[in-house]
């Protein structure tokens, strides 16, 4: 049964749980400056989950009574209901999510609520909350990457034979297929998912039990708490458990790589959608117009994703800078770890959700792609390879074809436009089968090794990714 207010000590009416040590209250400006509840309240459910596991362990170890545990569980359920209903009162004076919840718990269940913090500190408490939250975010992001890869592979399968120019230095290089090009991004995002999964292994270690920095003298069972919360194990050093945020930095580094890959894809979508290129169109729901130019259809989503990549990269640098000068163990600097971390996860989640939808609706303009591939002597390497297969050293073949390209530029024609006699003037080993080699279809079909751009290989790879991400 909850104590009446008159039976409770002054904690219930104090602004801070630690204020008994001080002779004067902090100023209102300092309260605003040091408070984190406006942003860390998003950890509330994870904070409650961690507290319930901690209370269960305390009761199992005989540190608190079974009645205390029952009261704490009842109070926490009430707090969860209030949070879900939007009626929980978050107070700036109480600094953070932890003290707000603890204060309300004491109001609801009295002394049992004041016993909850036995054997722990906000230092190991917040480290646990962040890891619980981040673990869930990683699982969600891995699934969003799966969805994006599935969408890309589906479009790739439909365009396994759609020929486009491949570029190096933004100059026409060799023919590839649009399906092959999209599968390059499917590979990148696959590695991104692997990085997140690997990061999760290091996130999934329990800090709780480290207390402020040196552990606790109570006979706690950290392994029980770890098992209850689904952690793979416990952090093995109490100083390290509360002081480092390398797991958050590692996540932000993985997020920066994902956004970098998104940014590269975005750049190509913007270029491909330009009327000067005209390779694709995006669905209207991903574009906006102009307030002055009625004809405009702007690829705002990929453009903004490019910009948000800088934002995510900035959060990574901020976290690295935050950690670099801190001595062991916990310092108030670490309060600054959350907003950038939260924003990174939010930005990445929204970006991947949008891109999975947008990628699946790309409208391909195959004729424009093919026309572009016919420019720039995209099959010049095929002619060089043809000569090598007839005994010419590659460097000699390279020189022969370079002369042919230069002559064609002067004449305003392509290598495929030359007659057999004209081609044989460059080297007598050239035969009538050369004209099949110099076609776009012949060029891509010849590259049938694993990882090549032959349509049959592209179909196999697309089907593999589709099955992998189903």
Swiss-Prot record:
**Any GO BP:** L-arginine biosynthetic process
Which key words tag this protein in UniProt?
A: Amino-acid biosynthesis, Arginine biosynthesis, Cytoplasm, Lyase
Q: Which InterPro entries match?
A: Arg_succ_lyase_C, Argininosuccinate_lyase, Fumarase/histidase_N, Fumarate_lyase_CS, Fumarate_lyase_fam, Fumarate_lyase_N, L-Aspartase-like
| Enzyme class per UniProt | lyase
Record GO cellular component, one term: cytosol
Q: Which reaction does it catalyse?
A: 2-(N(omega)-L-arginino)succinate = fumarate + L-arginine
- An example molecular function term from Gene Ontology annotations: argininosuccinate lyase activity
The main location class comes to cytoplasm
- Cellular location of this protein? Cytoplasm
Pathway(s) the chain acts in:
Amino-acid biosynthesis; L-arginine biosynthesis; L-arginine from L-ornithine and carbamoyl phosphate: step 3/3
**Classification via Pfam families:** ASL_C2, Lyase_1
Its family remark reads: Belongs to the lyase 1 family. Argininosuccinate lyase subfamily.
Q: What is this protein called?
A: Argininosuccinate lyase
The species this protein belongs to is Bordetella avium (strain 197N)
The lineage, from the top, is: Bacteria, Pseudomonadati, Pseudomonadota, Betaproteobacteria, Burkholderiales
Q: Which gene encodes it?
A: argH
């Amino acid at each position: 049964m909850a104590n009446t207010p008159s039976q409770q000590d002054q904690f219930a009416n104090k602004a801070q749980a630690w204020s008994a040590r001080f002779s004067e209250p902090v100023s209102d400006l300092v309260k605003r400056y040091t408070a984190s509840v406006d942003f860390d309240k998003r950890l509330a459910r994870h904070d409650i989950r961690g507290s319930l596991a901690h209370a269960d362990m305390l009761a199992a170890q005989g540190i608190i009574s079974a009645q205390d545990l029952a009261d704490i569980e009842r109070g926490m359920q009430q707090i969860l209901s209030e949070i879900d209903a939007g009626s929980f009162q978050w107070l700036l004076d109480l600094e953070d999510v932890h003290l707000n919840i603890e204060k309300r718990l004491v109001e609801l269940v009295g002394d049992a609520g004041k016993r909850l913090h036995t054997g722990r500190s906000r230092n190991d408490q917040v480290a646990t909350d962040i890891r619980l939250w981040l673990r869930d975010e990683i699982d969600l992001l891995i699934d969003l990457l799966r969805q994006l890869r599935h969408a890309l592979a589906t479009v790739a399968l439909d365009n396994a034979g759609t020929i486009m120019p491949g570029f190096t230095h933004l100059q026409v290089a060799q023919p590839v297929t649009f399906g092959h090009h999209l599968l390059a991004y499917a590979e990148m995002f696959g590695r991104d998912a692997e990085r997140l999964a690997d990061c999760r292994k290091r996130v999934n270690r329990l800090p709780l039990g480290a207390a402020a920095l040196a552990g606790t003298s109570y006979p706690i069972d950290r392994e029980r708490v770890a098992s209850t919360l689904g952690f793979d194990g416990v952090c093995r050093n109490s100083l390290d458990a509360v002081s480092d945020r390398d797991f958050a930095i590692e996540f932000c580094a993985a997020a920066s790589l994902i956004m970098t890959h998104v940014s590269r894809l975005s750049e190509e979508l913007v270029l491909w959608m330009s009327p000067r290129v005209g390779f694709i169109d995006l669905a209207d729901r991903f574009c906006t117009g102009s307030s002055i130019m009625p004809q405009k259809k702007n690829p705002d989503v990929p453009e903004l994703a490019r910009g948000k990549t800088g934002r995510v990269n900035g959060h990574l640098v901020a976290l690295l800078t935050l950690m670099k000068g801190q001595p062991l163990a916990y310092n108030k600097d670490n309060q600054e770890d959350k907003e950038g971390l939260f924003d990174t996860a939010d930005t990445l989640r929204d970006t991947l959700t949008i891109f999975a939808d947008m990628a699946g609706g790309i409208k391909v303009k195959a004729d424009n792609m093919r026309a572009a591939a016919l420019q720039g002597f995209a099959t010049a390497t095929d002619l060089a390879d043809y000569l090598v297969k007839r005994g010419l050293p590659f460097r000699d073949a390279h020189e022969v074809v370079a002369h042919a390209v230069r002559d064609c530029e002067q004449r305003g024609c392509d290598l495929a436009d030359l007659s057999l006699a004209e081609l044989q003037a460059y080297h007598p080993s050239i035969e009538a089968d050369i004209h099949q080699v110099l076609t776009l279809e012949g060029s891509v079909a010849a590259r049938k090794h694993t990882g090549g751009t032959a349509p049959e290989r592209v179909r196999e790879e697309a089907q593999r990714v589709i099955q992998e991400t189903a």
